[in-house]
């Protein structure tokens, strides 16, 4: 199949990478797994055994008229422990390479179908200036876009850093979440070829 390239000849690409059927269940599973893996999982609360103090019985068992109590660190008490205390945990889910690649192919194919993938011959800025990048994006009528380049472009990455709903990455930096998070994806021809090789 062929992809239209702005300002250049059409690019011949693999049907299996950019023309496959959309697998919603697979994409959902991989996106959820990717987001789960990004969770810190460092929250921690103390159980009744971990809260300091509470060694002595607050008052005697009988004769006070109050409810019996054995420790001031019971979860019933205001300064007590937490009944089912949250503990640090690993939220990551296992995703096979085949599934991950399949999800990326599925997303890229859907972007092509919805005319959300824009391919240009080359895209760069001369200096790390946000103003320069804004002008370039205005020419292409883009405001909510992920820019993917074939190689690390420090000037472009710095220029995009301060823009809302604009991100710039090289091919190694793309993932399922970033591809679905933006309205449009702008790729250079070199990036398209690299993605194709990566997912072959």
Curated annotation (Swiss-Prot):
Entry GO MF terms: rRNA binding; structural constituent of ribosome
Family: Belongs to the universal ribosomal protein uL4 family.
Signal peptide feature range: none
SUPFAM superfamilies per record: Ribosomal protein L4
Single Gene Ontology BP annotation: translation
Region (Disordered): 42-65
GO cellular component: ribonucleoprotein complex; ribosome
InterPro entries: Ribosomal_uL4 (IPR002136), Ribosomal_uL4-like (IPR013005), Ribosomal_uL4_dom_sf (IPR023574)
Organism: Aliivibrio fischeri (strain ATCC 700601 / ES114)
Free-text function comment from the UniProt entry: One of the primary rRNA binding proteins, this protein initially binds near the 5'-end of the 23S rRNA. It is important during the early stages of 50S assembly. It makes multiple contacts with different domains of the 23S rRNA in the assembled 50S subunit and ribosome. Forms part of the polypeptide exit tunnel.
Keyword Metal-binding: no
Protein name, entry field: Large ribosomal subunit protein uL4
Highest taxon of the lineage: Bacteria
Keyword Hydrolase: no
Record's keyword terms, sorted: Ribonucleoprotein, Ribosomal protein, RNA-binding, rRNA-binding
Subunit structure: Part of the 50S ribosomal subunit.
């Amino acid at each position: 199949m062929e992809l239209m390239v702005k300002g250049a000849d059409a690019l011949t690409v693999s049907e299996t990478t950019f023309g496959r059927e959309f697998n919603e269940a697979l994409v959902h599973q991989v996106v959820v797994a990717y987001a789960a893996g990004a969770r810190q999982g460092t929250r921690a609360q103390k159980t009744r055994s971990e809260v300091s103090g509470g060694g002595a019985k607050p008052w005697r068992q009988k004769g006070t008229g109050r409810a019996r109590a054995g420790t001031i660190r019971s979860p019933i008490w205001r300064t007590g422990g937490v009944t089912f205390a949250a503990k640090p945990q690993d939220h990551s889910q296992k995703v096979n390479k085949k599934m991950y690649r399949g999800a990326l192919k599925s997303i890229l194919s859907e972007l092509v179908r919805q005319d959300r993938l824009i391919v240009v011959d080359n895209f760069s800025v001369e200096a790390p200036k946000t103003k320069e990048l804004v002008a370039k994006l205005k020419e292409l009528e883009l405001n909510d876009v992920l820019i993917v380049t074939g190689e690390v472009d420090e000037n472009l990455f710095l220029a995009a850093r301060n823009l809302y709903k604009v991100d710039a990455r090289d091919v190694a930096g793309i993932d399922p979440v970033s591809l679905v998070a933006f309205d449009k994806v702008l790729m250079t021809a070199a990036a398209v070829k690299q993605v194709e090789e990566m997912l072959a």
